[in-house]
Amino acid sequence: MSLERCQSEWTEIEQEYQQLQETHKVYRQKLEELTNLQAICSSAISKQRKGLKDLKQSLYKCKKSCNGKDSEVINDLQVQIKERQNVFFDMEAYLPKRNGLYLNLVLGNVNVTLLSNQAKFAYKDEYEKFKLYMTIILMFGAVTCLFLLNYRVTDEIFNFLLVWYYCTLTIRESILRSNGSRIKGWWVSHHYVSTFLSGVMLTWPEGPMYQMFRSQFLAFSIYQSCVQFLQYYYQSGCLYRLRALGERNQLDLTVEGFQSWMWRGLTFLLPFLFFGHFWQLYNAVTLFRLSALDDCKEWQVFMLALTFLVLFLGNFLTTLKVVHQKLLKNKDKVKNN
């Protein structure tokens, strides 16, 4: 290559560099403008929230001493206030916010807000794929430990994998909630309890008590993975249809339980879910009996019994509540028709 050609290429690169500098300068200015707008929006939302809270309290006091016509106006205002709060929730999904206690402990004060719908949906999609792949891996891991490798070291690897899986799920779910996902209630707490349970299983030392419960736990893990796979497969299809109809949010997630939106087309999963819930109760009863034996010296046995009982109560009562509410709504619809 001749020197003139090298100089020509350098001139071309230099021109592109100058253009890059100008573009980057504009980018920095826009970024500063964006940061200022975010601060203005966050401040305005906080101010609106405070105003609505005061108004809500005033309306509550007025309602006690008003006539029927005024009561209708107050009810209408209360409905609008509730709708406005939902709008604020959607707005905040695109604004930086302080992390909750859990994310602060794990990640520190890092901004985890994703600014575009595309980025939010991509992260949510990655979360769902992670759950699916790990469910399959855990199912094969439990099968291997139960039927092929009866060694403590393989059990420890499996239990460590469970701890890592549930820890990762809680972090990813917290990030999704910061970005507008409406997963809440027991289905958030469920993974924290599962993380604790897996951690206790990991610390349970080898011994007669462990061997007496080992096969039952691994069989339960296989069943749970199979049900979770079924749930992912059918819930993801159902969510896709509901999103296309505009009835569900883009960041709605598949869960390990039953929610009201699953009523159409997914009720066949209920027997599998209830069987899994009662298996958790059976695990709790088995462990309580083991903890009552004179030979039982490990604290993990009683702690696991309590944890399985908490999981059973949370899962069973939450699922039962959803089914009960849906049946009542259907009953009211029949009466109105």
Swiss-Prot record:
Keywords: Coiled coil, Membrane, Nucleus, Transmembrane, Transmembrane helix. Pfam families: TMEM120A-B. InterPro entries: TMEM120A/B (IPR012926). GO terms for cellular component: membrane; nuclear inner membrane. Disulfide bonds: none annotated. Residues 1-39 form a coiled coil. It is a multi-pass membrane protein. Necessary for efficient adipogenesis. Does not show ion channel activity. Belongs to the TMEM120 family. This is Transmembrane protein 120B. The gene is tmem120b.
